[in-house]
Regions:
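Phosphate-coordination loops involved in phosphoryl transfer and adenosine-cofactor binding
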Residues: 2-4
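Charged docking surfaces used in two-component/phosphorelay signaling
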Residues: 16-24
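A generic structural motif
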Residues: 25-29
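Acidic, metal-coordinating helix/loop segments flanking the phosphotransfer/catalytic sites
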Residues: 6, 31-49
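Short acidic/polar segment at the start of the alpha1 helix of CheY-like receiver
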Residues: 11-15
Length: 51
């Protein structure tokens, strides 16, 4: 079972790099580009970790 990580980052280049690395390591990654979306994703997905 993959661990879920929510990445909160407004810079799309940085968030893409983080997603690529974590995907390769077997994590299920969700990206939120602002605080409002981060709260929505957190409540919906209940991630194991928020970065």
């Amino acid at each position: 079972m993959a661990r879920n990580i929510l990445v909160v980052e407004d810079d799309r280049n940085i968030s893409d790099l983080i997603r690529m690395y974590l995907d390769k390591e077997g994590f299920d990654v969700r990206i939120a580009y602002d605080g409002g979306k981060a709260v929505e994703e957190f409540e919906k997905q209940k991630p194991d970790l928020v970065l």
